[in-house]
Amino acid sequence: LAAGLDVPGLRGQSGVMSTDPRLFIDAPLSAGAAAPLSREDAHYLINVMRRGEGDVVRVFNGRDGEWSAQIAHASRKGAGLTVGDQTRPQQGVPDLWLMFAPVRRTKTELIVEKATELGAAVIEPVVTERTQSDRIKAERLQAIIKEAAEQTERLDLPELRTSEKLTAVLENWPDERVLVFCDESGDETDAAWGGARGRGLPMASALADLGDRPAAILIGPEGGFSPAERARLRSLDHVIPVTLGPRILRAETAAIAALTIWQSTCGDWR
């Protein structure tokens, strides 16, 4: 097989979205390299997508960009690829973390999926006083992250961190990173913005001068943060309290809304 594969229609060459399957594989990628497929990826290509030997796929590993590849062999026992040309150089996503209090399983999965699609670099479950469910099925969430990245043209996977108590997170917080605290109304809605008890600014306004500074978004549990947690958060210099509008949002909706606002204000949607 020649090192170059003629793969028309790839984004970045003709500007047209390719219809070739796209896979994340945890292996080095270079022209002519052999790339083994996991059992799950082989099943997906051969049995779901109905691809066979000689067919073209796109692959990425989060380090070496995106490459075209051909299915070199396919059988019931598995499949393997031969890597061709690089179709896109490696690009990162903005330095944005999403931190959220775990909710019910399907909602947590939705948050993780949408955070991947919307370009979060780090996803971290945070256990608060009112967190209703702190069970995290990391293997299942990693599979969701992989599939979402494959479908949305990401060139990397966000880091999924293990869950940690909010108190520990705040104690070890990096000084250079802003924490965008989604606190809908504050304790006193008539008080001036900011301080220990005032309401937060609308998120887009609060982020207007943030620029490219590293940031994290904190989404609370369905029951909200406790008074002690909110007081602690508002006492920290690196915390920016914000509101997401006049309506009370579900946790998963708040995460999607906050990520969208941040990307359009400070991220790679600009």
Tell what function each PLM region has.
Residues 22, 34, 56, 78-80, ...:
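Structural motif
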